[in-house]
């Protein structure tokens, strides 16, 4: 009898809590507007579609109800999507926030590396890792970008004068080789061995991640891990990915021990840090001290894995969507070619691009920025509020999920008139100075902004200069049909089909 009363009391409590929570949500939903949710399943039916359609539906609903829109998922899972500058600022600058639930799907692979960590751990890691992007180190990385872009250009030569082909896959492999070599000092040789296991596993993780976002069990991690067939597959792939990184770390540690380098621990003020020959990101982690202690292998692995994930799909999309726009806008491509000739001279095809020379490519930078406006590599970023937060005069409860839609922010017609039009002039110095700090944020803003943005810009510039100095890129027949899809990174659904003509 007593037990029955306890059960009945608990059930009643849960029902009351559910109704209360639902009423709060209804109030917020009414305030912001959004698609009408069905009982229990929310708006899940709207998203029960093929992959690019999921993205298109999200954008359609945001346009219809935005700039700030409320979505409801299974049961009481919900999120607010914001793109108005004042709400974006409040969310990105919130002192108390974690990455949203979506990111935890990557945790088995990336653990709590820089992207996923929060609080003190994040703060300490960001401090340690920041020197890896010092310009002295970036200068060395530029040599790697040159080498890998040269391989890409050579591999592309077989398409000159041929039928349309997908250039996205070539860019992906080039970016993967570049991040592997700069972060670990090792080569997976993806460009010449695309069937390499590591390359295949990284790709599979992206697909599994995307499928999980829209899985009905997405919000129930324990159940998902127990019963979902894809959970088993994910665990297997993660084991293999870790095995690879573990072996690279062990090998490098051994090399450093043998050369007597490992004992020479670095501190932030160590001048040698910036003058080291061929310093990789992994070397920095292997040599750094935190409170007098070196990082252990697991701590190093999570950071290296994070870089492998964040550091190649993002630049791949940046480069590929710039190619897409330049193929469609030959005048812009011509201006970049003129810039190449003006800076590097007529014999520019095999020029060795240095950090300093890359700073001179102003129009190219504008062209890349405009492509990142239309196709921001990370189109949404998510936060889990850790304290009640007021937006537009209404209080969002702590625990709420908020998505910042970079994709929609960049299409605000008041800031970017005729927003779908590709026009690099939007990034002239004069035009840029007239915009607010939250009008254009491809690398996010605030303390959690992208640590790799200068690295990314250098890699993108090198790849595009090498490509355009060698070939004129023309649109393939099916280029007009391009559709995009997104997991954490935006991608062309069927690649970027182009044709190539050799330059004189
Ligand atoms: C075009 C290229 C890139 C774009 C558009 C981009 C964009 C972003 C964005 C929007 C974030 C914020 C994510 C969030 O708040 O959830 C971010 C974070 C991050 N990015 Fe990038 N990224 C790019 C390239 C790179 C590269 C090349 C690296 C590494 C070499 C990198 C490493 C990271 C890391 C580690 C974080 C987490 C930083 C932190 O929370 O402290 N990114 N990136």
Put a short name on every predicted segment.
Residues 131, 310, 392, 429-460, ...:
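Cytochrome P450 heme-thiolate "Cys pocket" and heme-binding signature region
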């Amino acid at each position: 009898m007593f037990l029955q009363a306890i059960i009945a009391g608990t059930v009643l409590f849960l029902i009351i809590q559910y109704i209360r929570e639902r009423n709060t949500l209804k109030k917020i939903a009414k305030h912001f507007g959004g698609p009408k949710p069905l009982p229990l399943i929310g708006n899940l039916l709207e998203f029960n579609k093929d992959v690019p359609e999921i993205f298109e539906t999200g954008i359609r609903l945001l346009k219809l109800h935005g700039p700030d829109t409320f979505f409801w998922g299974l049961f009481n899972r919900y999120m607010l999507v914001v793109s108005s500058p004042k709400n974006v600022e409040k969310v990105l600058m919130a002192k108390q926030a974690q990455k949203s639930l979506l990111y935890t799907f990557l945790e088995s692979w990336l653990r709590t590396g820089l992207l996923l960590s929060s609080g003190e751990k994040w703060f300490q890691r960001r401090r340690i890792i920041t020197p890896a992007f010092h310009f002295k180190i970036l200068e060395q990385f530029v040599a790697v970008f040159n080498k890998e872009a040269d391989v890409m250009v050579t591999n592309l030569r077989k398409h000159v004068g041929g039928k349309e082909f997908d250039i996205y896959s070539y860019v992906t492999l080039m970016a993967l080789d570049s991040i592997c070599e700069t972060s670990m000092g090792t080569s997976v040789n993806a460009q010449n061995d695309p069937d390499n296991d590591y390359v295949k596993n990284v790709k599979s993780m992206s697909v599994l991640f995307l499928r999980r976002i829209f899985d009905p069990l997405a919000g129930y991690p324990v159940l998902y891990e127990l019963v979902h067939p894809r959970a088993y597959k994910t665990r297997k792939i993660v084991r293999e990915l870790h095995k690879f990184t573990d072996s690279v770390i062990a090998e490098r540690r051994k090399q450093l021990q043998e050369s007597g380098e490992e004992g020479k621990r670095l501190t932030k003020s160590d001048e040698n840090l910036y003058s080291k020959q061929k310093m990789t990101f992994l070397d920095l982690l292997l040599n750094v001290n935190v409170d007098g202690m070196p990082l252990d292998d697991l701590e190093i692995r999570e950071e290296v894995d994070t870089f492998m994930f964040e550091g190649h799909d993002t630049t791949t999309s940046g480069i590929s969507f710039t190619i897409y726009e330049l193929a469609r806008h030959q005048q812009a491509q011509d201006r970049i070619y003129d810039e190449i000739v003006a800076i590097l001279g007529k014999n520019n095809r095999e020029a060795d691009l240095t950090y300093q020379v890359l700073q001179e490519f102003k129009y190219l930078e504008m062209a890349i920025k405009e492509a990142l406006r239309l196709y921001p590599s990370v189109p949404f970023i998510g936060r889990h509020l850790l304290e009640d937060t007021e937006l537009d005069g209404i209080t969002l409860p702590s625990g709420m999920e908020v998505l910042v839609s970079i994709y929609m922010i960049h299409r605000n017609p008041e800031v970017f008139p005729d927003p779908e039009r590709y026009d690099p002039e939007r990034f002239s110095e004069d035009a840029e100075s007239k915009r607010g700090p939250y009008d254009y944020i491809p690398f996010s803003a605030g303390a959690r902004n992208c640590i790799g943005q200068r690295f990314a810009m250098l890699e993108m510039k090198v790849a595009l200069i090498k490509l355009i100095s060698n070939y004129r890129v023309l649109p393939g027949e099916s280029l007009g049909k391009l559709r995009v899809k997104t997991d954490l990174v935006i991608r062309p659904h069927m690649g970027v089909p182009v044709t190539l003509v050799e330059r004189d």
